[in-house]
Amino acid sequence: NSDEEKKVANKVEEKKADAAPKKELKKYKNLYTFDRSAEHYFALLITRGSVDSQKLMKILVDANEDWPGGELKVEKTDGKNFPLIVTVGLFENSTVAMDYLKGILKSSALKQSLQNISYNSVIITKDNLDALRKSGNLNVYMELFKKGYLGR
């Protein structure tokens, strides 16, 4: 009898899982999606110039020691049109990521390490970061970032 109850309970759980469709997000200019509730990274997108990536990552790791909520992972990668992308995260949503962005950009050590280079600092979801790395289309992402996250 208990085996039969388990089977029924499993079927109910399966139906619940089927009934909750994944959120289908509309793409902005066929490239990026906008979802404030998704996990986000803070990203420094280096577009021109040379920066000591190890020093930059150490500055971010040191700054993260003061961040409430635990360990943040600092990683570096690259992408089309980006010699260097440094990410910090993951943050539970865009609000938390934006709070981090506002705080970290006040760091004098960070400002000094980014002198004389071209870069953008943004918050971004994993899917959008993957799309940005492949496409290299920063202009479209910056439009979405300004409209969606900055309200401009």
Language-model-derived ranges and their functions:
Residues 1-152:
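Acidic/polar low-complexity segments and flexible, solvent-exposed patches
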